[in-house]
Amino acid sequence: MILCAGESLIDMVPSDGTFRPLAGGAVYNTAIALGRLGQDTGYLWPISRDPFGDQILRPLAEAGVNTDLCPRTDRLTTLALVTLTNGEARYSFYDEGSAGRMLLPEDIGPLPDTVTALFAGGISLVPDPCGGTIEALIAQHHDRLPVMIDPNIRPFFITDAGAYRARLARLMPMADIVKLSADDLEWLHPDLSPEDAARAVLATGPKLVLQTGGEAGAKAIWAGETVHAPAVRATVADTIGAGDTFNAGVLASLDRQGLLSKDAIAAITADQIHAALTLGAQAAAVTVSRHGANPPWAHEMPA
């Protein structure tokens, strides 16, 4: 089971002059996408008992995602106000004292033996206590489980850039795979080109650094020659959840190829990487073709 640990929230998405509440969150979207693609998936994050919490749980159940590690709480659900400019999403978060933000280490029980990989990232890595809790989870299990991290950096959400950079500096060496957008790479290394920035991240310890660039497609920076997979053409409705779905496609491909182990990732080949990037791009193309974070089901994917 691929365990996705990180935020779920309600995206307040513009709709006919008002806002429509949609369940979302970077790591949550990846969990939903993995479940819809047919992968054995678990989710770890506190879920509020408010009506929005019930709205968050329904798509997880529909996608077959295991939520046994999701504690219920009376704290309120995080809200993200979404604004769209030419289909590009920007977010304002209402998160103080929310259900997810207050995740503590004691809220997480022992991981079941069925967990075979760990995915984490998003805004859940920024504030405490939840950021420290996710960091501790990764620190506890990274020696045994392959770890993929997508920080999905939101500069406007970061109140202490130094502390956040320090957390990422601790997390990236524990990860086997790190996914970063061009914006993420610029924030991390503003004086470097995107590829040099990706190689700087690779030098900290991951075996793969995946760089996404929208229409430019995706690249994998690793010990071998750079692997590139072109973007899949799509009529873009909006980009909400595109990167999250890409992550799910990559993980699903690695799982199907029998590569979701630390040893297998360390010995991965260019062809295997290309297959993973391609499935990620194909899945993301479906998501951007429709409004909101609505990743594809397995039957909607190319044969």
Stretches with model-predicted labels:
Residues 10, 14, 49, 153-155, ...:
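Short, glycine/acidic-enriched loop or turn micro-motifs at the edges of active sites
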Residues 8, 26, 123, 151, ...:
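Active-site metal-binding loops of divalent metal-dependent hydrolases
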Residues 34, 181, 243:
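Short, conserved phosphate/pyrophosphate- and ester-handling motifs at nucleotide-, phospho-/glycolipid
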Residues 190-303:
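Conserved phosphate-binding/catalytic region of the ribokinase-like
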Residues 117, 123-199, 206, 216-217:
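Conserved beta-alpha-beta core of the PfkB/ribokinase-like small-molecule kinase fold
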Residues 1-66:
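Glycine-rich phosphate/adenosyl-contacting loop at the front of the ribokinase-like
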Residues 40-123, 147, 303:
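Conserved N-terminal subdomain of the carbohydrate kinase-like
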